[in-house]
Regions:
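Mg2+-dependent phosphoryl-transfer active-site scaffold
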Residues: 1-232
Length: 232
């Protein structure tokens, strides 16, 4: 199941995942931890299908945090394993956030450290918004898009949703996609132009400059050196 990208490259991530699943199945069958169900598909459906996995297992998340899982998919690098120890994910969403946030790099406080700070005490996020002088309504709008991500705009989809939101920028899909492409290509000149346009769009929609400044400096800027898509 090869995936072709825009640049003509091929991703072998799907093949890698399938290999891990098959090896795990063979080892579990060998040790009589699971039973063969008559076919590969039936055995997979009974024991490995996402619908039958317990994605709330505290034991599993503890193993991830402690580094006891040697080769978790896309989380096997030293950087990812260290991030797991630091973030200590307690939900599958937090694992997904870890996978995106380790790729983000900024000047000053790093996104992973900001996320850990917010996770330990979400009031820290509100304190940061208050430092920019955001109103209660502006904070509510940020909660709408960012509270599920613990106060961090870590994916292109969230960035676009904020731009499109009629109660924030009302920038439309065209401008949101233009901003996304600028970030995705890491073109600093295009990013600067997109930011300038964002300030104008926000102003035209009756928003304060400090609100636009917070969104650009504290949220969108997290992706200016690397942009990641929301995991499915």
């Amino acid at each position: 199941m090869l995936k072709y990208h825009e640049n003509g490259g091929i991703s072998f991530l799907s093949i890698s995942a399938l290999g891990r699943i098959r090896e795990a199945m063979d080892l579990l069958l060998e040790d009589n931890k699971i039973e063969w169900q008559g076919s590969l598909r039936a055995t997979y459906d009974k024991y490995f299908h996402p619908d039958v996995l317990d994605l709330t297992s505290k034991e599993m998340f503890d193993m991830l945090s402690n580094g006891d899982i040697f080769d978790a998919f896309q989380m096997s690098s030293l950087v990812a394993r260290n991030a797991m120890r630091k973030i200590k994910p307690e939900t599958f969403d937090e694992v997904a956030i870890t996978n995106t946030i380790i790729r983000l790099q900024t000047d000053g406080e790093q996104p992973i450290d900001k996320f850990v700070r917010y996770k330990k005490d979400i009031q820290e996020w509100y304190n940061d918004m208050n430092k920019y002088g955001l109103s209660k309504e502006e904070i509510r709008l940020m909660e709408k898009h960012l509270l599920p991500r613990t106060g961090i705009c870590d994916t292109q989809e969230i960035l676009m949703n904020i731009i499109i939101d009629p109660d924030i920028a009302d920038g439309g899909l065209g401008f949101a996609n233009k901003f996304r492409k600028s970030v995705g290509k890491k073109d600093q000149k295009k990013i600067a132009n997109a930011c300038s346009e964002f300030y104008e769009v926000m102003k035209s929609n009756g928003q304060s400059e400090k609100f636009a400044q917070y969104i650009i400096e504290e949220q969108f800027a997290l992706q200016f050196n690397y942009a990641f898509s929301l995991p499915l």
